[in-house]
Amino acid sequence: MSIEQEVIDIVVEQLGVDRDDVNSEKSFVEDLNADSLDLTELIMTFEERFECEISQEDAEKLKTVNDVISYLEKRKS
């Protein structure tokens, strides 16, 4: 499974949104109505699934689905 697909799966699962409503351009807060607790849970899930640590500083920069995909792809390489 690609990083993009796995990130989208996590977002759908964690935020309870329809898969059709999620694409790489969506903002977690503005488009997908995530609150601060949702964002914290998303970051924790990304860390667990991708076996990496995301600093608080980096986490604050991850505003869209694509931000997370790009970040994780860079970390994997």
Curated annotation (Swiss-Prot):
Associated pathway: Lipid metabolism; fatty acid biosynthesis
GO terms, biological process: lipid A biosynthetic process
UniProt keyword terms in alphabetical order: Cytoplasm, Fatty acid biosynthesis, Fatty acid metabolism, Lipid biosynthesis, Lipid metabolism, Phosphopantetheine, Phosphoprotein
Subcellular location: Cytoplasm
Cellular component GO terms held in the UniProt record: cytosol; membrane
PTM annotation, UniProt: 4'-phosphopantetheine is transferred from CoA to a specific serine of apo-ACP by AcpS. This modification is essential for activity because fatty acids are bound in thioester linkage to the sulfhydryl of the prosthetic group.
One matching Pfam family: PP-binding
Alphabetized InterPro entries for the sequence: ACP, ACP-like_sf, PP-bd_ACP, Ppantetheine_attach_site
Molecular-function annotations in GO: acyl binding; acyl carrier activity
Annotated ranges, domain Carrier: 1-76
Segments passing through the bilayer: none
Broad class of where this protein is predominantly found: cytoplasm
Residue numbers carrying O-(pantetheine 4'-phosphoryl)serine: S36
Family: Belongs to the acyl carrier protein (ACP) family.
HAMAP family tied to this protein: Acyl_carrier
Function: Carrier of the growing fatty acid chain in fatty acid biosynthesis.
Protein name: Acyl carrier protein
